[in-house]
Each structure stands twice: as structure tokens, then as C-alpha cells.
């Protein structure tokens, strides 16, 4: 299975002016934990890191220390996540029929989750990892006035990996460019094109490291795994 890792962002909410994936959790850069999970996932055979060239020397140094046995390629990132994934799709080997896309900042995803998504995407056109929403969700207007309360039994918190048929995802990205759609994940492009996206049960610990508080939580989770 082919894995694309969007890793081109700057950690503004983290309060830093460089790629947040270079920040460390337990003496390892965030991206290193993501790559180690991909290395340990038996279904993953190829990894593409979508990032800016200014980060490539740092990423190459990290890779040298990890000594992964799977091929890793660097792909030029875009100005948005959507553009970055589009670039990643164009750079996939011709043999790629399905692809997993996994945020580099979700460094706590386990090899089991990557394997589950890789196996499931062989039997559907699109999928996302997701977990049921536990909190009550309110929909509010621009003035902060509550408009409705959706039934949380129908609500899922989207995660990554997200998996897709490569040709279908390319077509959806092309349609997104034509229509001027701006989306925050690839599943939304499938939805806009009327293509079903299946849910694979995600992991409660699969958080996206976005804030300094998330770094502390990630460290706690990694420590607890060592002690279990």
C-alpha cells in the first residue's frame, strides 16, 4: 500500500515559525513517530512525504537516524493541504491503485490502524478513520447564538488515515480545481462528487498535534504505551 504524508505546514497554532513536525516528543521529532508507525505497518510498502524543500535537509537527517527499510520519496508541497495532496497524487508510482493519506501531525496512529485502513480500502472506493463524537455538539450562527443540536449518534470525528482509489481521487481533485472547492480533507472532495466514503473505526489516542498542550498529551500517551 502507498502512503502519502502531508507535511508542508508551519505550526502557527504551536507558536513556532518552522514546521511543527520537527518539534520533539520524547526526544524524537513528531514526523519520526509517524514514520516509525508506517515502518511497522506490514501493509505499507512505499512512503511519500509531501513537504517544502526547505524542510528536506531536516527530514533527510531524521530518516538517516531512523534507518527505515521502506522506500521514501520527497514530494513538493503546495500552498494548501489540498494542493499538497494533489501534488502527491501526481508523484505516486504508476502501479498505485489505492492510496492512504495520513497527516504527519497524527504521530500516535498505530501500525494496526494503518493496516486496517490499507486492508479496507481494497474493498471500497473511499474511507476515513473516525471515532464517535462523545460531546454534545451545538451549531451556532456568526453571533454565537445556538441554532441546533445535532444527534451525536450520527456524528463522527474525522481522523486520518484516509484511503481512496487513486484514479477516483485524481478525478475529484481535478473537479475541485474546476469548481473552486476549498476543503480540509480529501473525503470532502469525494462527498462533493457524490461518491460514498466508508468509516473505519479510528483510535481515541490518534490526536492531531496542533498546540503545545497536544505535545504534552502525546508524550503522556507514548509513555503509557511503554508501561502497558
UniProtKB/Swiss-Prot annotation:
InterPro entries: IspD (IPR001228), IspD/TarI (IPR034683), IspD/TarI_cytidylyltransf_bact (IPR050088), ISPD_synthase_CS (IPR018294), Nucleotide-diphossugar_trans (IPR029044). Belongs to the IspD/TarI cytidylyltransferase family. IspD subfamily. Pathway: Isoprenoid biosynthesis; isopentenyl diphosphate biosynthesis via DXP pathway; isopentenyl diphosphate from 1-deoxy-D-xylulose 5-phosphate: step 2/6. CDD domains: CDP-ME_synthetase. Gene3D superfamilies: Spore Coat Polysaccharide Biosynthesis Protein SpsA, Chain A. The keyword Transferase applies. This is 2-C-methyl-D-erythritol 4-phosphate cytidylyltransferase. SUPFAM superfamilies: Nucleotide-diphospho-sugar transferases. Pfam families: IspD (PF01128). The record marks 13, 20 as: Transition state stabilizer. It is an enzyme of class 2 (transferase). Catalyzes the formation of 4-diphosphocytidyl-2-C-methyl-D-erythritol from CTP and 2-C-methyl-D-erythritol 4-phosphate (MEP). Keywords: Isoprene biosynthesis, Nucleotidyltransferase, Transferase. Its EC number is 2.7.7.60.
Amino acid at each position: 500500500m502507498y502512503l502519502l504524508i502531508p507535511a508542508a505546514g508551519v505550526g502557527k497554532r504551536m507558536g513556532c515559525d518552522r514546521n511543527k513536525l520537527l518539534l520533539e516528543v520524547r526526544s524524537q521529532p513528531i514526523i519520526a513517530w509517524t514514520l516509525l508507525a508506517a515502518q511497522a505497518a506490514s501493509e505499507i510498502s512505499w512512503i511519500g512525504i509531501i513537504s517544502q524543500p526547505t524542510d528536506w535537509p531536516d527530514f533527510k537527517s531524521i530518516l538517516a537516524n531512523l534507518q527505515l527499510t521502506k522506500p521514501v520519496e520527497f514530494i513538493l508541497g503546495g500552498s494548501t493541504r489540498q494542493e499538497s495532496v494533489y501534488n502527491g497524487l501526481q508523484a505516486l508510482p504508476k502501479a498505485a491503485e489505492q492510496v492512504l493519506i495520513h497527516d504527519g501531525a497524527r504521530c500516535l496512529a498505530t501500525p494496526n490502524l494503518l493496516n486496517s485502513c490499507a486492508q479496507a480500502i481494497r474493498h471500497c472506493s473511499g474511507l476515513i478513520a473516525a471515532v464517535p463524537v462523545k460531546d454534545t455538539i451545538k451549531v451556532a450562527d456568526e453571533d454565537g447564538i445556538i441554532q441546533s443540536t445535532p444527534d451525536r449518534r450520527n456524528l463522527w470525528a474525522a481522523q486520518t488515515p484516509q484511503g481512496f482509489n487513486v484514479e477516483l481521487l485524481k478525478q475529484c481533485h481535478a473537479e475541485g480545481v474546476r469548481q473552486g472547492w476549498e476543503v480540509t480533507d480529501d473525503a470532502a472532495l469525494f462527498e462533493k462528487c457524490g461518491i460514498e466514503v466508508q468509516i473505519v473505526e479510528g483510535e481515541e489516542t490518534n490526536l492531531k498535534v496542533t498546540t503545545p498542550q497536544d505535545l504534552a498529551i502525546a508524550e503522556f500517551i507514548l509513555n503509557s504505551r511503554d508501561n502497558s
